[in-house]
Amino acid sequence: MTQDELKALVGQAAVAYVPDGSVVGVGTGSTVNCFIDALAAIKDRIAGAVSSSVRSTERLQALGIPVLDLSQVERIPVYIDGADEIDPRGHMIKGGGAALTREKIVADLAERFVCIADASKRVDVMGRFPLPVEVIPMAAAQVARRFGAAYGGLARVREGVVTDNGNLILDVTGLHIADPLAMETEVNQWPGVVCVGIFARHKAAVCLLGTPEGVRTLNF
């Protein structure tokens, strides 16, 4: 199966985790697009969606799925999103689509995070995929230097990208993230950092992993 076919497979499988009558949290990215397309088939059974990005909002609305403002929702039963990497404990690197801050906000509302990914995203230790960090523009160089000093990482500004919040993305390479929760906690305290793309506090409860043999369900 191709990577696109694996994404479609887990996108379809994730629909089973959406309770009838609920508001569902929707992430961002190519795998999530497959979930949105599958969600359209049951749009009459749900109350709507809360979206983590402008791109996802536009796709949801184009398919006739109501999108609610975050202020209208106190809790949601499930948040469905992809990952750039996921480790054996359900910790993730996210933010390849530059929507990490809003993704983390929506994930914080959810009772359960269901990650959808193809098998290539499963790793033993995170850090091979560049770690995205949303930063206030004036702090980009300062935060980049700090990554080098603290972790030996090389941080570069992602060219041509401005987040939905008007900020920049640093992509940090050369990391070995043995303790995701500790790194997430520390980096989020650095001045100028809006959000780091480590999801350890908001880790996955379930991962639907697309494999050539079908969907593999990992519970954390």
From Swiss-Prot:
Entry keyword Isomerase: yes
Binding-site list for substrate: T28, G29, S30, T31, D81, G82, A83, D84, K94, G95, G96, G97, K121
SUPFAM superfamilies in alphabetical order: D-ribose-5-phosphate isomerase (RpiA), lid domain, NagB/RpiA/CoA transferase-like
Disulfide bonds: none
Pathway the protein contributes to: Carbohydrate degradation; pentose phosphate pathway; D-ribose 5-phosphate from D-ribulose 5-phosphate (non-oxidative stage): step 1/1
Catalytic activity as recorded in UniProt: aldehydo-D-ribose 5-phosphate = D-ribulose 5-phosphate
GO annotation (BP), single: pentose-phosphate shunt, non-oxidative branch
First-tier enzyme category under EC: isomerase
Domain of life: Bacteria
Assigned GO CC terms: cytosol
Secreted in keyword set: no
EC number(s) recorded for this UniProt protein: 5.3.1.6
UniProtKB keywords: Isomerase
Single GO MF annotation: ribose-5-phosphate isomerase activity
Active-site residue list: E103
Recorded family membership: Belongs to the ribose 5-phosphate isomerase family.
Function: Catalyzes the reversible conversion of ribose-5-phosphate to ribulose 5-phosphate.
UniProt protein name: Ribose-5-phosphate isomerase A
Source organism (scientific name): Leptothrix cholodnii (strain ATCC 51168 / LMG 8142 / SP-6) (Leptothrix discophora (strain SP-6))
Gene from which this protein is expressed: rpiA
